[in-house]
């Protein structure tokens, strides 16, 4: 059976339990929101195929358990991941503080050139906010990572987050193929236009 996609990207959602990783995954993969999700036990994944620059990209998105006792299960899934979303809950200060621990986990277990993005989730709950946008942005700048505030409930910036991460992976792949071509390795490879990587920040805006 012929492949129905040009690229397969493996993405990971990591972060503390209860920050809304599963809700983000379901909003993006099925455009659905459910407040009754129980904490993910172990690992689950969803697939959605998107189009970027005329190429079909199959996104295999893994939802990892945030509880400490599942950390050993999760570490095996870092291998092969091309993009990782670090998710915290803007109404939960501790989940934000733990992002640094999750980044340390990535540095220990993931590929050195994995694309990363920090997401401050539940930005629809502004009245219960404990972490300001500015603090989220500053943390992202400190680590050289892109940042978005999202809401799975209101669908704010969910599409933008996944598309931005996929585009950054695509840009990196194109750059690698260009480098490979220019060094004479392998046969001809068709390259789509590569965009220079920029660190940009998006704000949560509710209409």
Swiss-Prot record:
Keywords carried by this UniProt record: Cell membrane, Cytoplasmic vesicle, Endosome, GTP-binding, Hydrolase, Lipoprotein, Magnesium, Membrane, Metal-binding, Methylation, Nucleotide-binding, Phosphoprotein, Prenylation, Protein transport, Transport
Cofactor or coenzyme needed: Mg(2+)
Reactions performed catalytically: GTP + H2O = GDP + phosphate + H(+)
Any single biological process term in GO: positive regulation of cell projection organization
Residue positions binding GTP: 17-23, 35, 39-40, 66, 121-122, 124, 152-153
Family, similarity comment: Belongs to the small GTPase superfamily. Rab family.
NCBIfam families linked: small_GTP
Name of the protein: Ras-related protein Rab-8B
Organism: Rattus norvegicus
């Amino acid at each position: 059976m012929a492949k129905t996609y040009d690229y397969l990207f493996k993405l990971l959602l990591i972060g503390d339990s209860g920050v809304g990783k599963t809700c983000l995954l379901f909003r993006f993969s099925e455009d659905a929101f459910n407040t009754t999700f129980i904490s993910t036990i172990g690992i689950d994944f969803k697939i959605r195929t998107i189009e970027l620059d005329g190429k079909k990209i199959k996104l295999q998105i893994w939802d990892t358990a945030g509880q400490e006792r599942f950390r050993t299960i999760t570490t095996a899934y870092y291998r092969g991941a091309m993009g990782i979303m670090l998710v915290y809950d803007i109404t939960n200060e501790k989940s934000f503080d733990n992002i640094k621990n999750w980044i340390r986990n990535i540095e220990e277990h993931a590929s050195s050139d994995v694309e990363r993005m920090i997401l401050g989730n539940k930005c629809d709950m502004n009245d219960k906010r404990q972490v300001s946008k500015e603090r989220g942005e500053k943390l992202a700048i400190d680590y050289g990572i892109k940042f978005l505030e999202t809401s799975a409930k209101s669908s704010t910036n969910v599409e933008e987050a996944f598309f931005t991460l996929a585009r950054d992976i695509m840009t990196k792949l194109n750059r690698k193929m260009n480098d490979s071509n220019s060094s004479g390795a392998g046969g001809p490879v068709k390259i789509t236009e590569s965009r220079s990587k920029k660190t940009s920040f998006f704000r949560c805006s509710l209409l």
